[in-house]
Amino acid sequence: ATMNSFEQINKIIDNEDLEKLKEEVQNIHIDKELEEYIIDIIDASRNPKDYDLDELVDIIQFGASPRATIDMFKAVKANAFLRGNDYVSPIDIALIVKDTLRHRIILSYEALAKEINIDDVIQKILEKIDIP
């Protein structure tokens, strides 16, 4: 693929339609319990002891930031929209949580030395927090 190949890109949506789609995604309903579930997942990455995840205290150097919560809300709404729903379900969270958090949780050097997988860390968090 060369730079010349960009000349053949066809426009499939205009700005007005894109803005309408963004508004539709923003209007996807997310239940308060699911919002709390997402907040707990993010918080558990920063404060594992508060969630009885003592084994992760020395493994997680930096948990996901509060900004990750906002991005997770956006991602689950987008996923619900792409699945044809006008509401977020626990399935939407399950489908995107690892992809959303994988680069936001920084493992400690100890964890890296032990070759601990970030997906396993996220899974441990998910297993401790009840799905609404």
Summary of predicted features, one role per range:
Residues 1-55, 82-86, 90, 111-113, ...:
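Conserved C-terminal "switch" segment of AAA+ ATPases
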